[in-house]
Amino acid sequence: MTIAANSHLSAARTAKNDEFYTQWADIEREVNAYLEFDPDVFRDKVILLPCDDPEWSNFAKFFALHFVDFGLKKLISTSFAPDSNVAGAFYSPTLFETADPKFDASKTRLNGKKFVLERKDLNGDGVVNIDDLEWEYLQGNGDFRSAEVTALRDEADIVITNPPFSLFRPFLTWLFEGRTKFSIIGSGNAVTFKDVFAHVKANRMWKGATGNSSDMVFGVPKGVEIKAADRAKAERLGYPSDEKFDYTRLGNACWWTNLDHGRRHEPLQLMSMADNLKFSRHKDVRGSEYPRYDNFDAIDVSYIDAIPGDYEGTMGVPITFLDKYNPDQFEILSLTQTWSDLAIRKYPSQVLVDADGNRKTVGALNSSPAIKVDAPPLGKSYFEVGGEFFVATYKRILIRRKDA
């Protein structure tokens, strides 16, 4: 094997963030949530599935199967050229392609492919399904940013896919430039990026109905490295390795969408502040006041079910709050990042003291919500700033009741 080929293979084996194949059950659950809210959500629509070769992708197979049920007008799927993809080291064309007169041994590696299903029974079997797909090679490699795939985006009413995780942010920008509806899979932690958060705050996108705060299983190409614990968890969830894929799991994967669903309109059932302090199931909430931040005018709420329903001020809540967020109940104000316009204090350089007493000068406190304490906590990390002591919490979303 040449040095270049060996390098390509090595890169492919560690491309865990990009080559994730979504399971049929996860697609079905999410799509059903949209249909429950609006049975005609897909009717007479053009759906684009970029990054989804029907030879491998469950997205294309799922929507082809339900083409008539959903009343689709047109289904378009595109795939990325193997030689433009680090996972291409594992690629080999299938019989679906090689048996077709259009097969080109060079283009199969250098060019992307486009698959189209329309309201045409091409094989005369009386139904419109995946057997009626028409395909052709794209002029380019199938990158979603290319002119030809962007033109397909502009033709589509809805884009649905699991984009490469490393390209989630540029893919999201590409979607908003096209002003299309979408449902895509990404990391729940993506909301901590300024550009992503801006869309969430403005109610231009939100979490999907399913897969939140739970494991999602993905297929990966054979030969890609998987942590033993993740492989074992996928097996326990019912996905042992098979002839086609190995399987892994991700605990922070979720759907991001601007398609409406009923679960985002379900109000959180919350206790009052007094009842939380008395009856909360969390020991660190019962009998204590909610701590206030030193650098934001807000109280810290460490658990979603401990949000005081009668509090009228600003609250900092975990980013998993978005799993339960009802835009009719709460307003999203900001995120506790350095770029937040709600910060009321900026700290000079700080000394971070870890649990073992090691000291280091840092600037990290400005990117976290800070709680002032009277004395250094025992056995925990803390910050020193000008003789004052602070502990930092995880990133928080700042919210306020809509009726406050």
Feature-to-residue mapping (PLM):
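Class I S-adenosyl-L-methionine-dependent methyltransferase catalytic core
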Residues: 1-404
